[in-house]
Every structure is written in structure tokens, then in C-alpha cells.
Curated annotation (Swiss-Prot):
Disulfide bonds: none annotated. This is Tegument protein UL46 homolog. Residues 437-481, 522-590, 693-743 are annotated as: Disordered. It comes from Equine herpesvirus 4 (strain 1942) (EHV-4). Abundant tegument protein. Trans-activates the immediate early genes.
Length: 743
């Protein structure tokens, strides 16, 4: 017994410790932690997203596809099954809660809209309209109404914008069709996402291009619609614009819609991967085209209530479309940007952002922009799904792919171009350090008050470790904006001349604030919001403003970007040039756009040429009689000028703009050198012609065909030819010579 027991123990004890250590030690491995994190993210995500994203049919169908593609049949099936709007359930509930928190009735919301429009019209056109003070109880209430009411309100504020019943019934039908098209597009975008955000998806990229081109087209339509509405309102109230400028959108709606339908990304590709999406965007654009006809041809009621009813209906339409478009852009920024070639440097994304920024520049006083962070606080499902998908993708790939790192690098390059300090690493970076980054290896940074600065190593990607300089302050984990500290002090300047950045802690940010003055590269005045909503931070993209206002009220202004297919226009030129703003010490400061500020076009570079030459109020245009400005064959005529020959005709702006509200303008040739005005060129031409006649002596024409003399004086650009037609010799026509000299 003892021998057998001893033999059994010897046999058992050989790998006892190994087996006990393997089976008994529960120390988690990195893979265990990653798996647990992925499962926890999945459980949290399933509670806030549509159940159709995790359906068995969708999971099985995508599991057999190894190209990270999503067939349209899967997308269409999810759209048809989502009959209750589950794709934005969380977002809609949050929006309705925000509207309910305003405690405004239908009449109160009506007052908010109409007061906001009068204030916008006064500042955009200079018309003398009565400003009845504040536009609501609080800024938050005003912004909630202007952003969410038209989409999530219980009913329309203005049901009959037109004078007759037939157009009103047709408008109601078009509005319902437009809402249905918007819902279909948003559902398509929601369910078209592939499973892997770190792998390129060609069909998803094509669909995103179609959506972004559609967004750019709609924003240009909105500018055209605002031009139409403002002109009709000024006509109905017998007011004229004081701040004169050209149309903010020169292309008519039919041309904009036709251009997208014939040469949009989905149609041009010819692959059929976005056939359903292109049909949905075409339906929405066609409805907008019908509405263009309705608002152009149908008249309003002549009484006061009829005009205000049409204004409220127009603002409701604009805010409805604008909310839909910025929903698409915010969704792309929340994660879909990872499937765009080049990330945030994608040309289609830049075009959409440029058109949104242009619309915000001209109509942002009336139609504010929702910050992406605020949108993400309402639409939690999209952000959480991308965190879950990214964690699962990292587990599968083992490390971030080069495609995903390229997208992150594009964001970092944009942040550098926005003017942030070189050492600042706000927000997201491409090195995946995060909040729990590894401790620095090497010398620690010097104290804040030290005169010397130290460098330390931090792990980099791959086998090569690089030296990077980190900021002395704690990275901001909430937003990539540079804000003011809680005490209200601005950023101080160190002895070496570098700015010390002071940031808010995450708990100090007010996430209830919707809108940021200066979301884009211009800064509007504070008339559309309370005095407590001044801008205190700058960023190129969407951010939320902090709860602490800026004590200095300094804003940063940069020139907006215009696309290659957009006509450049001059900014409004007010009658009063006295500015109420004082320039701060910052050398890069540029004044915000305001009716009392200097003209923005004066701040541009010397080689900038606007397509329309504005006329200062009270300064009459000189009518050119018996004179024409002709462009040589090498010069391109302006976009809004007739292309026929103007010889033997009178050049009059009233003939070209007979039906335009802004009839005091004339086209300005692009070939005119900005260093010389037309008056100076005319005087120079007349003086040189007179000097030439004095040298050559007086000549008398011998026939009727020789009664016309042409004096040509090339400008510095060589593109101007001035023709002077007379019925007799220049020496015998002092009136004609005096008229030319006076120019």
C-alpha cells in the first residue's frame, strides 16, 4: 500500500505545480481584457442603437463578405423593417425633451422665429425694421426652437404661407414628401455602415460622396431661397436694402438640381452600388425644385399677418432642411469619416463644409449651427457603436491599420492648420495614448516656472521610438478647443513668448449649450443671443462653448474658403463706416462681420477680385453714354454679365437688373486691374488721346466712314479697350471731350 501510494504521489507530483498554476491563476491577460472590453461595449451599444444593426440576418450576411462592403439589399431590408424610426430614437427623445424644457407655446415659438428674422434682416440688408428687444426668455430656448422645432415640433407654426388655398394644399403635400425623403436618406446613411472602421470600403465611400455632394447642393439652394425670401419681404414692407450686395447664390435651382442629377457621384460611378441612395437624393431635390416654383410664383397675403405667416413658414422650411443637412455632416464626423479617402481632407467633405460655412456666414444669425459634441450627447448610439466597432477591429487586426492611421493623421494636420500651438495635443491623436497613456520614460518635464525646458521620450508606433515634446498642461479630454480657466483669466504668456494654455476640466464644460459663435471662420455679432453667450474659444470645427464667458470678448477671424465652382462675391458694404469694435493686441485679429464694422473685402489680399462691385448707399452710379467697356478675346466675362457684343449700345445696369431687387449694380469685369479704377482709366485714356492729338495736329475726316476715331489704351493687364464714338472731330466736340475727361 505504501509503495503504491508512494508511486502514485511521485507520478502525480511531476506536473502538479504546472497544472495548478495554469488552472488556478486568474491573472487577466491583455487579450482577456480586450475581449471583456469589446463585450461590455457591445452590451452598452445594443441598448441605445437600433436592433436592426445587430439582427441575426444582417450579422450572417455580412460575415460571409470579406471586402468590408455592405450590399444595398441589406440596407434596403433594414430600412423597410425600421417603421418606427428606431434609427434616431435616442436623438428624437432628447430633442423633444429640449423643446419641452423651453416652456414656450405655439405663439411663443412664433414670436421667437419672427423676432429672429427681423433682427437677421436688419443686419443683413440694413433695412429699417423695428427691433422689439430680446427674442425669447433664454438663449437656450431660442436655439432649441430655431434648431429643433421644425423637425420635432408637434405641428407646424405657419400652415398657410400663400394667399390662395390651392397653393397651400400643394405646399403641404410637398412638405410631407420632403420629410419622407429626408427620413429615407437618414435611414440609408444609418444602416449602410460596414463592420470594420479600420478597413477601406469602396462602396461606402461612394455613398458618402453622394451624400456630401447632395449636402453641398442643398446648401446652395438654401442661399438662393434666402435671397428670394428677403427680396419679397422687403418688397412687401416697402423697404429697400441699405447694405447692397449681389446675390448670395447666382445659380438658379433648376441648374443646381440638374447638375447633381446628371453628374452626381453615384450616377457618374455607374456601378449601381448607390442606386437606392441616388434615387432618394433625387426625390428630395425634385421636391425642393417644386417648392422653388411655389415660392416664386404664388403671392402672399397683403396684410401684416400674411407677411409674417409667410416669413415663419419660410424659416421653418429653412431650419428643417438645415437640420437634415447638419445631421448628415455630424454623423460623418461621429465616425463615418474613417471610410473617406484622405479622412477630413477629402474633397467632397471639404466642399460640403465650405458650402455649409458659406450659408452660416450669410444666414447663421437666423439659422444656427449645432455643435457636434452637443449632437453626440443626444445621438449617443452612433458614437458608442463606433467605439465598439473600433475595439473589435483592434482585437482582430492586432494593431491600428495604416488606413485608419492616415485618417487620424489628416485630423492632426487640420488641427495644425487651425493655428493651435505646436506642442498642444488636444483631443484625439494618432498614437492611441488616450487618458491612461504610459508614463514618460526619461527625464520629466521642467516645472511650469522653470526657465529651461526638458524633453522626454514617449513610445511611438513601430519599433522606432521618437522624441516628442508634450505640453506642460494636462490634455483636454473633452474638447479640442482652447478655453479659458474657471477664474476667467485669459491665457498667460511665458518668458520665452509661448502661450501657456489653460483648459477646463471635463466637469466645467456646459454641455447644454448648443451653439457656438464662430463655429466657422467668421464671427457674427451677439444680437441673436444674449450677452452671456459671447465667444471664448476658437476652433475650425464644431465645439461647445464653455460656461465661463470671455472677459475680453476677443474673437479670431479668418477668411472663409470658397470652392472652385462658386462665384466669389463682395461682402456687404454698409453706409456707416464707424466701427464699434476696438482691435485687440492680437496681430492676427480681424474684425467680425457686422453692419457697423469695416468691409470684409477690404481685409482680403490685393489679388482678390469679387465678382460684383458693391455700391455704397447714397452714391449714384455714373451712366456711361456712347461708351462701352469691351473685353478682349483672352478675357473671360463676369459670371452674371451678358456675353453678347455691347458695341453701338448703351451700358446701363438698370437694363440688366430690371427685375432684381438690387438694381444699382453693374457687372465688374474680372480683367480690370484692381490698382486702377474705371474712372482713373477713363481719365488716363482721355489725357493720352489729347496729348497724341496735340503732337500729330488736327485731322479732318474726308468721308463719313472716317468720322469715327478709336483710341485704344492698354491697361496694366492688357484686357481693357475703350472705344469713343463721335459724330465729328474730337477737336470740334468740347462737350464730348469734357464728358470723357470728367470720368
Amino acid at each position: 500500500m505504501e509503495a503504491s501510494g508512494s508511486a502514485s504521489w511521485a507520478r502525480v507530483s511531476k506536473n502538479l505545480i504546472e497544472r495548478r498554476a495554469v488552472k488556478g491563476c486568474l491573472l487577466p491577460t491583455p487579450s482577456d481584457v480586450m475581449d471583456a472590453a469589446v463585450m461590455a461595449l457591445k452590451d452598452a451599444t445594443e441598448n441605445v442603437v437600433s436592433k436592426h444593426l445587430f439582427s441575426v440576418d444582417r450579422t450572417n450576411a455580412l460575415s460571409v463578405i470579406h471586402t468590408n462592403a455592405v450590399p444595398e439589399s441589406i440596407i434596403t431590408t433594414a430600412i423597410l423593417r425600421d417603421t418606427n424610426g428606431e434609427y434616431r430614437r435616442e436623438y428624437e427623445d432628447s430633442a423633444k425633451c429640449n423643446l419641452a424644457a423651453t416652456d414656450l407655446s405655439q405663439d411663443g415659438m412664433w414670436e421667437v422665429v419672427i423676432k429672429s428674422y427681423w433682427r437677421y434682416l436688419r443686419e443683413s440688408s440694413g433695412a429699417e425694421v423695428v427691433d422689439r428687444g430680446g427674442v425669447g426668455n433664454t438663449t437656450q430656448s431660442v436655439l432649441s426652437v430655431l434648431i429643433l422645432q421644425s423637425t420635432f415640433g408637434k405641428k407646424r407654426l405657419s400652415k398657410n404661407p400663400f394667399k390662395h388655398k390651392g397653393p397651400n394644399v400643394s405646399y403641404k403635400s410637398n412638405l410631407e414628401n420632403l420629410r419622407a425623403a429626408f427620413t429615407k436618406i437618414e435611414k440609408y446613411m444609418y444602416y449602410m455602415r460596414p463592420n470594420d472602421p479600420m478597413t477601406k470600403s469602396e462602396d461606402t465611400e461612394l455613398r458618402l460622396h453622394e451624400l456630401l455632394a447632395y449636402v453641398a447642393t442643398c446648401y446652395r439652394w438654401l442661399l438662393w431661397f434666402m435671397d428670394l425670401t428677403d427680396a419679397k419681404v422687403l418688397k412687401n414692407i416697402d423697404k429697400g436694402p441699405v447694405i447692397t450686395h449681389g446675390p448670395r447664390e447666382t445659380r438658379p435651382p433648376d441648374e443646381l438640381v440638374r447638375r447633381h442629377l446628371k453628374s452626381g457621384p453615384a450616377i457618374s460611378a455607374g456601378t449601381g452600388d448607390a442606386l437606392t441612395l441616388s434615387t432618394a437624393t433625387a426625390d428630395a431635390l425634385i421636391v425642393l425644385l417644386r417648392m422653388s416654383v411655389s415660392w416664386t410664383s404664388h403671392s402672399w397675403k397683403s396684410n401684416t399677418h400674411g407677411v409674417t405667416g409667410a416669413i415663419v413658414a419660410a424659416v421653418e422650411l429653412v431650419t428643417l432642411i438645415h437640420h437634415h443637412l447638419q445631421y448628415i455632416i455630424n454623423t460623418i464626423f461621429a465616425g463615418y469619416v474613417c471610410w473617406l479617402d484622405g479622412g477630413v481632407e477629402n474633397s467632397y467633405l471639404n466642399s460640403a463644409l465650405r458650402n455649409q460655412g458659406r450659408f452660416d456666414h450669410f444666414a447663421g444669425k437666423l439659422v444656427p449651427i449645432m455643435a457636434t459634441l452637443s449632437w453626440a450627447n443626444m445621438e449617443k448610439g452612433t458614437v458608442m457603436w463606433f467605439k465598439y466597432a473600433l475595439a473589435k477591429s483592434i482585437v482582430c487586426h492586432g494593431s491600428p491599420t495604416q488606413h485608419y492611421l492616415t485618417v487620424l493623421d489628416s485630423i492632426a494636420s487640420k488641427r495644425t492648420g487651425a493655428g493651435l500651438p505646436p506642442g498642444a495635443t488636444f483631443g484625439r491623436t494618432a498614437n492611441f495614448q488616450g487618458q491612461f497613456g504610459c508614463p514618460p520614460q526619461g527625464p520629466l518635464p521642467a516645472p511650469p516656472n522653470s526657465k529651461t525646458k526638458s524633453m522626454f521620450k514617449r513610445p511611438g508606433r513601430g519599433s522606432v521610438r521618437s522624441l516628442k515634446q508634450l505640453p506642460a498642461s494636462t490634455p483636454n479630454m473633452v474638447s479640442s478647443a482652447t478655453t479659458y480657466n474657471a477664474g476667467g483669466n485669459t491665457a498667460a504668456t511665458s518668458g520665452q513668448g509661448e502661450e501657456a494654455i489653460q483648459i477646463h476640466a471635463s466637469g466645467e464644460l456646459n454641455d447644454c449649450i448648443w451653439y457656438l459663435n464662430g463655429t466657422y471662420s467668421h464671427q457674427r455679432s451677439d444680437s441673436s443671443s444674449s450677452d452671456n453667450s459671447s465667444c471664448s474659444s476658437t476652433e475650425t470645427e464644431y465645439i461647445t462653448i464653455s460656461s465661463t464667458p470671455s472677459p475680453t470678448r476677443e474673437v479670431v477671424y479668418t477668411d472663409p474658403l470658397l470652392g472652385s465652382d462658386e462665384e466669389k462675391d463682395a461682402s456687404p458694404q454698409p453706409a456707416n463706416t464707424v466701427s464699434e469694435y476696438s482691435s485687440p493686441a492680437n496681430s492676427g485679429y480681424m474684425r467680425p462681420r457686422s453692419t457697423l464694422a469695416e468691409e470684409i473685402w477690404q481685409l482680403r489680399d490685393s489679388d482678390y477680385t469679387p465678382y460684383m462691385r458693391p455700391s455704397r448707399a447714397g452714391r449714384p452710379r455714373l451712366r456711361l453714354e456712347d461708351q462701352t467697356l469691351q473685353t478682349l478675346p483672352g478675357c473671360k466675362p463676369p459670371a452674371n454679365s451678358p456675353e453678347d457684343n455691347f458695341e453701338d449700345t448703351l451700358f446701363s445696369s438698370s437694363q440688366i437688373y430690371s427685375d432684381n431687387a438690387h438694381s444699382t449694380f453693374r457687372p465688374r469685369a474680372r480683367c480690370v486691374d484692381d490698382e486702377y479704377g474705371l474712372t482713373a482709366l477713363a481719365a488716363l485714356s482721355a489725357s493720352q488721346a489729347k496729348a497724341r492729338r496735340v503732337r500729330l495736329g488736327t485731322t479732318t475726316p474726308t468721308s463719313a466712314n472716317e468720322a469715327t476715331e478709336k483710341y485704344t489704351t492698354p491697361s496694366s493687364g492688357g484686357c481693357i479697350r475703350r472705344t469713343l464714338s463721335t459724330s465729328e472731330s474730337p477737336e470740334s466736340s468740347p462737350e464730348q471731350q469734357e464728358r470723357v475727361s470728367s470720368l
